[in-house]
Amino acid sequence: MLKKNIYLITPNTLNKSFYYFLPKLLKTKRIKYLQIRLKNLSKKKLVQEIKKIKKIVNKKTKIIINDFPEIASLLNCDGCHVGQKDKEISLVKKKFKTLKIVGVTCHNSKKIALSSVKKGASYVAFGSFYKTNTKKT
């Protein structure tokens, strides 16, 4: 049987509830990837939050940083996730060789997905499939 894992993405703001539930979710051993997606923070505050999260996350869960490969590399995270308007995948892979994973957003475009894979993306993300307020920030 195919083992099912979860790719968890943080909410845009982290509160006590997030830090309460994160260890409980990690104990299920089903969270294979945790994408830290905090678009409204300064880089300094983002670094602080990543360090705090890294103390909680086990080695089996890969930490992916949204939009900032330089921070992901600096903090020895497993990878980064970039959007279409962010840095070019091939440049990220060339400049930040320590990042094992470089993912990219493809929205709903098969063409972008195929192009991203050719450029070296570790994975492609599609969505959102339903109307959401998440992508507004």
Language model features: what each stretch is:
Residues 72, 130-136:
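A short acidic, helix-capping loop that chelates divalent metal ions and anchors anionic groups
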Residues 1-123:
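Conserved N-terminal beta1-alpha1 strand-loop-helix module at the mouth
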Residues 124-125, 135-137:
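Short, intrinsically disordered, charge-balanced linker/junction segments flanking boundaries
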